[in-house]
Structure formats: structure tokens, C-alpha cells
């Protein structure tokens, strides 16, 4: 679910910044999800949105699905059992790893999505 995803992000980025900093970033990190990603970090969120859309096509509810995972020194690990839990955890894990690898540009936080994300 989205709360677990937030914790997974913080684990992946080793708490360098709060997960909430990603909630209104660019065109895809948050609630908008349209237009052209503003950078590679935003592209991570676009891929995550697409992953969630695929999960929904398989009858899952990614924003609400809880799963088992661990924050480890070498990275996050999914330990879920059901198909939806495994799928959603994999979406979140891939996105958290992607976000951890990309640079965060404060200029892309809380942008005017009506103008920039068409």
C-alpha cells in the first residue's frame, strides 16, 4: 500500500530525505500521472504508475494491498505470499530502487502540473 511504499522509499534512499518529498514531484510522483516526465526521477514514478495499472488489470488494489517486506542493509526485500501482494511489492520495490538511484531536483517539487504536465 502507499504507506508501505513510503517506508520502502525511505529505506532505499537511506533516509536522505522524507518520502513526502516525492509526493508532489514532477508529473508522476503524486496524484497527477500525466504528460511527459520532467526528469529520470519522475520517470521512475511513471513506471510505478504503469506497474500499478497492470496490477489493477489483474484484480489487485495496489494502493490498499498490504504486503510483507524487510528493510535490509543491502536493500529492500519482498516476502509476500499472495499473487497481489507479490505483484504490488515488486512494483514498489522497483520504484524505490529507481528513486534511490536518481538525483532529486528541488525545482521539480510542487510544480504547476496544469501547465507542465499536459
Curated annotation (Swiss-Prot):
* Pfam family for this entry, one: Phospholip_A2_1
According to its UniProt record, in which tissues is this protein expressed? Answer: Expressed by the venom gland.
- CDD domains cross-referenced by the UniProt entry: PLA2c
Predominant location: secreted
Subcellular locations according to the entry: Secreted
What S-S linkages are listed for this chain? 11-71, 27-117, 29-45, 44-98, 51-91, 60-84, 78-89
Q: Which GO terms describe its molecular function?
A: calcium ion binding; calcium-dependent phospholipase A2 activity; phospholipid binding
User: What is its biological role?
Assistant: Heterotrimer: Snake venom phospholipase A2 (PLA2) heterotrimer that acts as a potent presynaptic neurotoxin by blocking synaptic transmission and synaptic vesicle recycling. May act by binding in a calcium-dependent fashion to neurotonal pentraxin-1 (NPTX1) and neurotonal pentraxin-2 (NPTX2), but not to neuronal pentraxin receptor (NPTXR). Also binds to taipoxin-associated calcium binding protein 49 (RCN2), a protein localized in the lumen of endoplasmic reticulum.
Protein name, please? Neutral phospholipase A2 homolog taipoxin beta chain 2
- What is the scientific name of the source organism? Oxyuranus scutellatus scutellatus (Australian taipan)
Lineage summary = Eukaryota, Metazoa, Chordata, Craniata, Vertebrata
